[in-house]
Design a protein with these regions (language model features):
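Formylglycine-dependent sulfatase
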Residues: 2-264
Length: 264
């Protein structure tokens, strides 16, 4: 995918690296590799602004559409690009869900954090599916050392649950990794045709709506409270992972109708 030459907000790579090399490298790079102390990380943070981090699941840049298609059909994406930075040569560390998420939060390759397999959903920890080592520094532990409250809302899928009395997920399942609050249960992918769009197995809860509602409620309560500690709120959405439905006529228009009948 060639970089756009029409984006007035585009910053040359050399200039971006020069600007961000100081605090960003010290904070997120060397700390994860254990080359600087946690105290250095805490001191490197400037004014300790509040942080809200949104994650989407299995989303990639539009690559095969005509020029201008994404701006015309993805208005919210266009708005975000116009008001922020777009990294056009960014690559995921792994194709597998669990491995990629663990790399994102630790800054390590799967061969380094060792949680390289996508974890089986709805099962407790398995010896054949290595878990992320809680002793490894990650985004949450670094921010907590810097005085932040770190709250996670949404899809986790970085570790399997710790066996609770009733076998369900509990908030403590991710507190081992430095997070102050979660919002169990976890949510993976639900791609059956009757539950397109992130519904759970019982067809009772739209996961992304649940996550957004939980995050909005937490943020409203926090901002109206007397707690003036800086916070990092991570909102991890399931979609577009589950947005797999398409208009019925696409089968016929694309010549797939008979193939579809053979597998339904």
């Amino acid at each position: 995918m060639q970089p756009s030459t029409e984006n007035p907000n585009r910053i040359p790579r050399r200039q971006f690296l020069k600007r961000s090399a100081g605090a960003s490298a010290a904070l997120l790079g060397t700390q994860f590799l254990g080359l600087v102390s946690r105290e250095t990380v805490a001191a490197a943070l400037p004014d300790k602004k509040n942080i809200i981090l949104f994650l989407t699941d299995q989303e990639r840049p539009p690559m095969w559409w005509p020029e201008g298609w994404d701006d015309a059909n993805l208005p919210n994406t266009k708005r975000l690009k116009e008001r922020g930075l777009t990294f056009q040569y960014a690559f995921t560390a792994a194709a597998m869900c669990t491995a990629s998420r663990n790399s994102l939060f630790t800054g390590l390759y799967p061969a380094q954090h060792h949680a390289a397999a996508t974890l089986t959903e709805d099962y407790a920890q398995s010896p054949t599916e290595p878990q992320l080592d809680p002793s490894l520094p990650n985004l949450a532990t670094c921010l907590k050392e810097a005085g932040y409250d770190v709250v996670y809302k949404g899809k986790w899928h970085m570790t399997s649950r710790v066996e609770a009395a009733d076998g369900t997920y509990i908030d403590d399942d991710i507190s081992r990794y430095g997070f102050d609050e979660w919002g169990a249960p976890d949510a993976g992918g639900d791609t059956r045709k009757e539950t397109f769009g992130g519904a759970d197995a019982l067809h009772t809860v739209k996961n992304d709506q649940r996550f957004i509602d939980d995050a909005a409620a937490w943020l409203s309560n926090r901002l109206s409270s007397a707690n003036d500690k800086p916070f990092c709120l991570i909102v991890s959405l399931v979609n577009p992972h589950d947005c797999l439905s398409y208009p019925n006529q696409y089968d016929e228009d694309g010549g797939y109708e008979e193939d579809r009948k053979s597998v339904v």
